[in-house]
Amino acid sequence: MADNPSGLVIETYKLTKIYQNRQIALNDVTLSIEPGSVLGLLGPNGAGKTTFLRLVLGLHRPTAGWVKLFGKTMSPNAADLRRRMGYIPTNPQFPAGMTPITYLDYVARLFGLTSDSRKPRLASLIRAVDLLPVSGEPIAGFSNGMTSRLAVAASLINEPDLLIWDEPTHGLDPEARRSMLELIKRLSREKSLIVSSHNLSDVDEVCNHAAVLSRGQLIYNGSLQDLKGRMRRNHYELDLEGDQKAITKATAAIKNMTEFKTVSLKQRRLELRLNDDSTNTSALANVFMTLADSKVTLVSIRSVGQQTEQAFLDLVEKEESRGFARAYQVEEAA
């Protein structure tokens, strides 16, 4: 703890990366990751996720700001810090002629493991990722799932404290994806992880914190629960009972209400989308009164949309709107 007074696994301050003096890939990102955290790194393509990971890994130097791992500043020369990390890139590639045994032995040598420690470590990892039956087979014939499991074993060979996995479920079939998620859950009991992903259901299942990047800026950093709490609950489905003519008449009346962006009826299911400036409580109260006046029974009502995904989309949409407004103001000033 003396070497790491903050106790944080990762700490960044005003982290910025500009390529070729013109492309701002990452802008003023400040965040911290505590031990035991499983951070879901989210953002659309081009948001800055890969740049952020490269800076954390020490593969690039920041233009401004800094990254600290375990209380020490990360840089391309900080080999001691990289030894405490395990990394999986998107779509990992391996030498086709090697086998799992020869490849993992090669990685272990790079980390300086002795012969006596390499053999039991390799055997344990190969069993753990279920590659024992093919441990002597060329990697060239491996499926995506087998390749991903080999990447997991390679990222664990140095017994790292921090795992950084970039799109670990990308390209996997449902069974392989499920195995990967279960593995992340098990590892999270003893390690800190950063999981970069486009699959929001995966993040929702295995992560307890989220960082959302948009156009190089950090637009959210906090718990997944708080992220869901930011969701606009403006999309509802109502199941109805009653005379079909009465339901149709009530729907027509609801369509005339100004609170709703869209109103659609499919048989006895009414779908409502509120305008952004509408108050949910009063709008739904008007709907309930209209249904009651038309002798239509409301059987059930539910908010639609996967919560993490909707909250993420809302954040990105708001940030894009702010970006447009800023650009418009600059244009007007000019």
What are these regions (language model features)?
Residues 20, 72-75, 218, 241-244, ...:
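Short, surface-exposed acidic/glycine-rich loop or hinge patches that mediate macromolecular interfaces
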